[in-house]
C-alpha cells in the first residue's frame, strides 16, 4: 500500500493491492486522517473498508481510496473494472452487503464509470459544531 497527498488538493490517496488484508490497512490510514472523531470517523472508515473489500472480492486488481476534507466529506474508491456494482435484492443473501452499508452511512453515494474502470463515491455530512 502507498499513501500519498493529492497535489494541490486537501485530500488523502491510498493505493492498495489485491490482498485480503487491504480493508484492515485502509482502516488504519483513513481513521486517523479524519479530523473529526466520533460517528463521522467511524462511518467514513467503515464505508472505505467495505468498498475496498468489494474491490478485493470482485476484481482482479487493486485500486485507490481518496478522501477530501470538505463539507460534505467526499470518499472515492477507484478500481479497474468497468462492471457496475449491484445492491443485493434479497437481504438474506450471504455477503454482498457492502453497498447497502455505505448507503445507510453516507448522505449520498453513486458510481461513475471512468476510462480506466469505475469510481464508487460517497459523501458524509460533518456534524454541526
Predicted regions and their residues:
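Long, contiguous hydrophobic alpha-helical segments, chiefly transmembrane helices and signal peptides
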Residues: 46-55, 63
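STAS-typified acidic loop motif
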Residues: 13-25
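Conserved beta-strand-loop-beta-strand hairpin that lines the nucleotide-binding pocket
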Residues: 1-13, 56-129
Amino acid at each position: 500500500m502507498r499513501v500519498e497527498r493529492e497535489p494541490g488538493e486537501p485530500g488523502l490517496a491510498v493505493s492498495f493491492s489485491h490482498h485480503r488484508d487491504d480493508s484492515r490497512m485502509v482502516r488504519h490510514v483513513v481513521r486517523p486522517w479524519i479530523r473529526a472523531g466520533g460517528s463521522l470517523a467511524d462511518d467514513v472508515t467503515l464505508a472505505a473498508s467495505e468498498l475496498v473489500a468489494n474491490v478485493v472480492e470482485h476484481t482482479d486488481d487493486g485500486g485507490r481510496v481518496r478522501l477530501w476534507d470538505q463539507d460534505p466529506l467526499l470518499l472515492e474508491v477507484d478500481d479497474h473494472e468497468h462492471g457496475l456494482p449491484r445492491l443485493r435484492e434479497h437481504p438474506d443473501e450471504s455477503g454482498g452487503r457492502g453497498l447497502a452499508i455505505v448507503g445507510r452511512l453516507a448522505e449520498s453515494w453513486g458510481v461513475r464509470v471512468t476510462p480506466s474502470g469505475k469510481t464508487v463515491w460517497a459523501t458524509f455530512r460533518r456534524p454541526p459544531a
